């Protein structure tokens, strides 16, 4: 971000929390698709919003970062994690 800012390039990131995907579904959810596994329950217990993320949850942060409202924002990471960062993690 510091090297590209003089060129007018903003460098930011979104740090998603726990989202259920094909890659991690077996770790977070039982085969019924509704019941969290022991690990999934541990993650949810450390997530103040007590749910996994949905793809649409990322849209607000993304829309902000690409909007004129973020024209003076660079070098930042926006967590979209249901408050997970507020805890020490798993």
Which sequence ranges carry the predicted segments?
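Small-residue (primarily alanine) positions within well-ordered alpha-helices
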Residues: 1, 13, 53, 59-61, ...
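A short hydrophobic alpha-helix cap/turn motif
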Residues: 2-6, 19, 53, 66
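Short, small/polar-rich loop/turn modules that mediate ligand/substrate recognition or access, typified
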Residues: 5, 10, 73-75
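A glycine/serine/threonine-rich, flexible loop-to-helix segment
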Residues: 6, 18-46, 87-90
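Conserved SDR Rossmann-fold cofactor-binding beta-strand/turn motif
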Residues: 10-20, 66, 79-81
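A conserved structural motif in NAD(P)-dependent oxidoreductases
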Residues: 34-35, 47-58, 69
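Short C-terminal tail/terminal secondary-structure segment
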Residues: 63, 74-90
């Amino acid at each position: 971000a510091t090297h590209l800012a003089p060129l007018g390039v903003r460098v930011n990131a979104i740090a998603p929390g726990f989202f259920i995907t094909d890659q991690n579904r077996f770790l977070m959810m039982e085969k019924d698709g509704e019941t969290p596994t022991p690990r999934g329950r541990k993650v949810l217990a450390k997530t103040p919003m007590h749910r996994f993320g949905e793809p649409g949850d990322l849209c607000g942060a993304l829309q902000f970062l690409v909007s004129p409202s973020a024209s003076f924002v660079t070098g930042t990471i926006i967590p979209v994690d249901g408050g997970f960062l507020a805890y020490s993690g798993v």
